[in-house]
C-alpha cells in the first residue's frame, strides 16, 4: 500500500548528531513513536496526517546512538487504535521498551491482556484536535475503568 506523506512533514534524518553530554545509566526516552512502515502496518483511514515511515529498527538505532538504555513507545495517532506496529516494535525490543497503546471501547479483555503481555503499560487518551477526532467522556471513562493494575 502506498501512502503519500503529508506536506511539511520532515523526512527521516539518517545522520543525527550525538549529544555532547553523556546520559546517565538507565536513561529512558519516555515518548517516541514508530511510523509504519505503511506497507506492513497501514495508517488509519481517519488519520489527520501521514508521516514518512520510521521503523522500529530506525528507532532502536537512534536510541542506541543517543545513549538511551530504553524507550517508551507511544502509539502514533496516525495508526489510530491499530496497535500492531507498536506491539511488533515491543516484541523486537529485547526487553528494552514498554508501550502506551490507543484503544477503543470495543477492545476485549483478551486484547488488553495480550498487549500487557507484549509490554504495553498504559493507554493514551489524546485530546489534541489537530491529531484526533473527539472521543466522548463516557467512552474514555469506560476504557479507564477496564484497565487493571
Model-derived regions: residue spans:
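An N-terminally biased module of ancient metal coordination in phosphate/nucleic-acid-related enzymes
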Residues: 1-81
Amino acid at each position: 500500500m502506498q501512502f503519500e506523506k503529508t506536506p511539511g512533514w520532515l523526512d527521516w534524518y539518517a545522520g543525527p548528531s550525538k549529544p555532547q553530554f553523556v546520559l546517565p545509566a538507565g536513561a529512558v526516552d519516555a515518548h517516541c513513536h514508530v511510523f509504519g512502515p505503511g506497507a506492513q502496518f497501514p495508517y488509519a483511514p481517519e488519520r489527520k496526517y501521514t508521516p514518512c515511515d520510521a521503523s522500529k529498527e530506525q528507532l532502536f538505532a537512534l536510541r542506541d546512538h543517543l545513549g538511551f538504555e530504553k524507550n517508551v513507545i507511544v502509539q502514533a495517532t496516525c495508526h489510530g487504535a491499530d496497535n500492531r506496529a507498536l506491539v511488533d516494535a515491543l516484541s523486537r525490543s529485547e526487553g528494552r521498551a514498554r508501550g502506551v497503546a490507543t484503544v477503543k471501547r470495543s477492545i476485549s479483555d483478551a486484547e488488553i491482556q495480550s498487549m500487557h503481555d507484549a509490554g504495553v503499560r498504559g493507554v493514551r487518551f489524546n485530546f489534541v484536535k489537530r491529531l484526533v477526532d473527539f472521543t466522548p467522556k463516557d467512552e474514555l471513562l469506560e476504557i479507564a475503568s477496564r484497565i487493571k493494575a
